[in-house]
Regions:
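Periplasmic/extracellular loop-to-transmembrane helix junction in inner-membrane transport proteins
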Residues: 4-77
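Alpha-helical membrane-interface segments at transmembrane helix boundaries
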Residues: 62-70, 74, 97, 104-107, ...
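Transmembrane-helix boundary motif in ABC transporter permease subunits
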Residues: 74-104
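Membrane-helix interface segments
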Residues: 92-100, 145-148, 188, 244
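Generic hydrophobic transmembrane alpha-helix motif, especially the helices
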Residues: 105-161, 168-169, 224
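Short cytoplasmic-facing helical segments at TM-TM junctions of multi-pass membrane proteins
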Residues: 165-204
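C-terminal transmembrane helix and the adjacent membrane-cytosol boundary/short C-terminal tail
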Residues: 171, 249-281
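Transmembrane alpha-helices
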Residues: 188-221, 250, 254, 266
Length: 281
């Protein structure tokens, strides 16, 4: 006969599919009390309520989230600095678009995680600190958390949504406005700064929003790469290896909350600055 207590202590022996849970309510009730499978809500709540407490000797939850945010923002900033200018140029200059669109289009379908083997071969566990040749100091140890391989995965994930939206935003600008401004003597700089960028801004901002969301989703995978010893993604991975499911769930909730807050910030900017776009369609 099937021993409930024995199975509860050996959760790997069965598969907890929705169908199994519905067809075995008695066994499910026993397993709910197993903190390795489903930790009590109060344990998860305690971790979230005290983000400054040390967690399984891996630093605080808030500290790891902060490190992850810095990594995401660094990789994301690099994607913005390349994606927006290149996208605007490709949208405005048809020749450049024809030249680069096919080339970039070959890389767009590649998932960010597919780059991992190449990234590790290229960069190994090098960080910004080692790449800059900094001496051992407080700045060195801070920048040593920013592994180039992690930043690249985040960068490549955010780049294409930003680039595509910038191209689309410029291509949909009314060309009559551009031609009229050129006839009236406007310089290329004036056309870019006073016509193209303001008109394309809603599409660009939407691309920035999508890109940040993708960058945040790439975070956990990036922090699983060799060389990572901090960050909420690494915290989740380490917590799993030591059987701390409560920390895993708390980390997942933290990622969800921070990602939602970042998305809400961009939505607020879109509503605040570009509400007119809704009525111009």
């Amino acid at each position: 006969s099937w021993n409930l207590e024995e199975q509860a202590q050996n959760p790997d022996s069965i598969c907890y599919s929705p169908g199994y849970i519905l067809s075995h309510p008695a066994q499910t009730l026993v397993l709910v009390g197993n903190s390795l499978i489903l930790p009590p809500l109060e344990e998860i709540g305690a971790l979230l309520a005290h983000p400054l407490d040390n967690v399984i000797a891996m630093g605080t939850l808030a500290g790891n989230i902060g490190i992850s945010l810095v990594r995401v923002l660094c990789g994301y900033a690099a994607a913005v600095l390349l994606g927006v200018p290149l996208g605007v140029a490709m949208g405005y200059y048809a020749g450049l678009h024809r030249l680069l669109n096919l080339f970039l289009g070959m890389f767009r379908p590649i998932p960010p995680l597919a780059w991992v083997p190449l990234v590790l071969a290229w960069f190994g566990v090098s960080s910004l600190a080692t790449a800059m040749g900094l001496p051992r100091s407080e700045l060195y140890y801070y920048l040593n958390n920013l592994k180039i391989s992690m930043l690249f995965i985040i960068f490549i994930g955010a780049l294409f949504p930003i680039l595509t939206s910038a191209v689309h935003g410029v291509q949909t600008v009314n060309r009559t406005l551009v031609d009229s401004a050129r006839v009236l003597g406007a310089s290329e700089r004036d056309i870019f700064t006073k016509i193209l960028l303001p008109a394309a801004a809603p599409s660009i901002v939407n691309g920035l929003r999508i890109g940040l969301g993708v960058a945040w989703m790439c975070l956990v995978s990036a922090e699983m790469l060799p060389g990572s010893l901090s960050g909420v993604g690494y915290l989740i991975t380490h917590a799993y290896t030591v059987g701390r499911t409560d920390v895993v769930i708390a980390g997942m909730i933290s990622i969800s909350v921070v990602g939602a807050l970042l998305d809400m910030a961009f939505q607020w900017i879109e509503r605040r600055k570009y509400a007119w776009k809704q009525f111009s369609r």
